[in-house]
Amino acid sequence: SKAYGSDEAWQWESSGVDGYEMTPAQKDTAGTQIILHIKPDTETDHYDNFLDEYGIVAIVKKYSDYVRYPIQMERQHERQKPEPDPKPEDYKPEWETYTELETLNSMVPIWKKQKSEVTDEEYANFYKEKFGDYTDPARVIVSRTEGTANYNALLFVPSHRPYDFYTKDYEKGLALYASGVLVMEKCADLLPDYFSFVKGIVDSQDLSLNISREMLQKDNQLKLIHNALEKKIKNELHAMLANDREKYEEFWKEFGRQIKFGAYSDYGMHAELLRDLLLFWSAKEQKMVTLQEYVDKMPSEQKYIYFAAGDSTDLSLIHI
């Protein structure tokens, strides 16, 4: 490695076990060259996978696709040689192998672009490719914050619940990036349980690349991001309820049980936060209503909200 404007170069070497060694070196140009030596394969570990061209591309796409600097690699391709002119009657196409320097990473992540620069179709395609869904999301939430917590977030409310959503196998969490580098594929600490259906990505400049899961749980920045996202998701769902009632009622059919569970759990600690998102079937109105809509139509002498509980609407009705 040689700094710009310096006459000295240094070689840093480590076996990856304990410590490192630095010695003077010879280098004509400024910059850093990194050489990695792969361990020999063992019966259980196949390190040569890291030397496979497609394996390297996959690793870069997974962990460093959104690093803002280009990650380039020489790749070999085949192409047809130019046809001779004039072309003989017995001419057969010939092919040649050539090497091309390719940039492997996207560099500019979609969540760092202004919402006005991205179409609904581009958001939908990114969501379906990233999270393996076959339908467009019901809601796209873009959040950017600078100040006490610096982060970019791109969140999606799915149109339907995953097949395992109400099972113990379902894992909540958002993909967590630190300055464009993937740190954790599913960070559960970014979402409260009652919003566990939300999928998406959070990219923060305030997190260390080598932060552990245990350190994340104690990280104050993560708690600030959690609180900000919780408020943002709640506001977006409330906006959907107010401005697109039909879509919200479709959302409620898929995830309403989770919202109700959130209002009920922890001794009702979150009931105040979630009450405006709740929907109930009104026998009188013959449609879904919010608590506020019910209260607005109560007779002046009525003091309480009346309800009937049961396994189904029909079983809850009292026939006179």
Predicted regions and their residues:
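Conserved GHKL (Bergerat-fold) ATPase module
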Residues: 1-318
